């Protein structure tokens, strides 16, 4: 288990150094770093994560909302919906 610790620490340091580089900060990378911190620092209150989840749910597109696909890999539709034909639609097979 101890041999896994150095690669994990290296990844965390690499992610933080990317954030320090400057103006090219990516919101998804920043969120990844924020979400991975509780694993190393359990003192952070859970209230912040509830607020983050509520903010993410408000920011997502609901049924028939437009969903521009200008950021590949970024989910613009709420959970259970997919971006099809420029709108948030129900997933195929449901």
Swiss-Prot record:
Keywords: Disulfide bond, Ion channel impairing toxin, Knottin, Secreted, Signal, Toxin. Residues 23-58 form a propeptide. The keyword Thylakoid does not apply. Residues 1-22 form the signal peptide. The presence of a 'disulfide through disulfide knot' structurally defines this protein as a knottin. Belongs to the neurotoxin 14 (magi-1) family. OAIP-1 subfamily. Probable ion channel inhibitor. This is U27-theraphotoxin-Cg1a. It comes from Chilobrachys guangxiensis (Chinese earth tiger tarantula).
């Amino acid at each position: 288990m101890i041999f896994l610790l150095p690669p994990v620490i290296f990844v965390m340091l690499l992610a933080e150094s990317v954030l320090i580089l400057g103006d090219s900060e990516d919101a998804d990378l920043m969120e990844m770093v924020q979400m991975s911190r509780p694993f190393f620092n359990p003192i952070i209150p859970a209230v912040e994560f509830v607020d983050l989840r509520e903010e993410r749910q408000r920011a997502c597109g609901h049924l028939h909302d437009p969903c521009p696909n200008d950021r590949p890999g970024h989910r613009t539709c709420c959970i259970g919906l997919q971006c099809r034909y420029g709108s948030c639609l129900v997933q195929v097979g449901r």
